[in-house]
Amino acid sequence: MVGEMEAKEKPKPSPDYLMQLMNDKKLMSSLPNFCGIFNHLERLLDEEISRVRKDMYNDTLNGSTEKRSAELPDAVGPIVQLQEKLYVPVKEYPDFNFVGRILGPRGLTAKQLEAETGCKIMVRGKGSMRDKKKEEQNRGKPNWEHLNEDLHVLITVEDAQNRAEIKLKRAVEEVKKLLIPAAEGEDSLKKMQLMELAILNGTYRDANIKSPALAFSLAATAQAPRIITGPAPVLPPAALRTPTPAGPTIMPLIRQIQTAVMPNGTPHPTAAIVPPGPEAGLIYTPYEYPYTLAPATSILEYPIEPSGVLGAVATKVRRHDMRVHPYQRIVTADRAATGN
């Protein structure tokens, strides 16, 4: 009906969906202009991330996504504080990383347990600190007395007596599941923690999901008709330089210039009959190098001896004028009279 809102089903918890939510939260926090403006949007995003993590955690530990009843009775009586210690079996399993299993990547597993059970969960005792030097320095100091005890998990809760007992019981059951080591290849909780760490670092890639570009190319290849063609012809290798042009070279041009003049300096009678070709005004080189085209008049700047023949030895020309020395002293009339 018009005006009624259709109830949409929430997406199922999956690593890909959790990665999208984490990317949206990271994008919102990276924008300073929008930080603190969309309060309801940030709250809904945090609630959805908590829901997906909770469902994935329950699916990992309990083997199903069925939610346990979280209903609590009404509070009766004053607020009390209850606590319980669960010692970690370090002596039985000395090589197992119980602290990392309980806390999770960046403390996400412990925070998820606290949000689900309503209790505060802390790892205390020897080996609870990552920095061993700092642990030795704090040993024996006030508020650090727990370092003298064995490694344990401290669970505390504050609520009414009837409600606190239920919360504490649920938290103890969940923590006991974490204190049971699993085989190396069968630890589903460790796989989920590594997946969450990869999502936080931005390096998570789902092996079942292909990249969009690859999927599109595969789909296009499957739908397009396949045409069988012959092998491509093998082309000869490209030449390093262009071949010699078919036009005339420079030697016929030089011969044409020399034959156009008689030995006595008069023009050849056939020069006026034979019209010059289109290449008569240019010097053409056989290869395409830059700056190779020049006017042909540059050759005529130098006089050709009438008796000179192409390839013959040029005769020496005696010059009778006196060469002027560049540093020759100029003698004027007054200096010639005095003899200086």
UniProtKB/Swiss-Prot annotation:
Protein's organism: Gallus gallus
Gene that encodes it: QKI
UniProt subcellular location: Cytoplasm; Nucleus
Pfam families (UniProt xref): KH-I_KHDC4-BBP, Quaking_NLS, STAR_dimer
GO terms under biological process: intracellular mRNA localization; long-chain fatty acid biosynthetic process; microglia differentiation; mRNA transport; myelination; myofibroblast contraction; negative regulation of 3'-UTR-mediated mRNA stabilization; negative regulation of cold-induced thermogenesis
Record motif Nuclear localization signal, residues: 323-329
Motif interval(s): SH3-binding: 275-278
One cellular-component annotation, GO: nucleus
Name the UniProt record assigns to this protein: KH domain-containing RNA-binding protein QKI
An MF annotation (GO) of this entry: mRNA binding
Domain of life: Eukaryota
Domain KH: 87-153
Role of this protein: RNA reader protein, which recognizes and binds specific RNAs, thereby regulating RNA metabolic processes, such as pre-mRNA splicing, circular RNA (circRNA) formation, mRNA export, mRNA stability and/or translation. Involved in various cellular processes, such as mRNA storage into stress granules, apoptosis, interferon response, glial cell fate and development. Binds to the 5'-NACUAAY-N(1,20)-UAAY-3' RNA core sequence. Acts as a mRNA modification reader that specifically recognizes and binds mRNA transcripts modified by internal N(7)-methylguanine (m7G).
Record-linked InterPro entries: BBP-like, KH_1_KHDC4/BBP-like, KH_dom, KH_dom_type_1_sf, Quaking_NLS, STAR_dimer
Family under the similarity heading: Belongs to the quaking family.
Subunit structure comment from the entry: Homodimer; does not require RNA to homodimerize.
Keywords carried by this UniProt record: Cytoplasm, Developmental protein, Differentiation, mRNA processing, mRNA splicing, mRNA transport, Nucleus, RNA-binding, SH3-binding, Translation regulation, Transport
Keyword Ribosomal protein attached: no
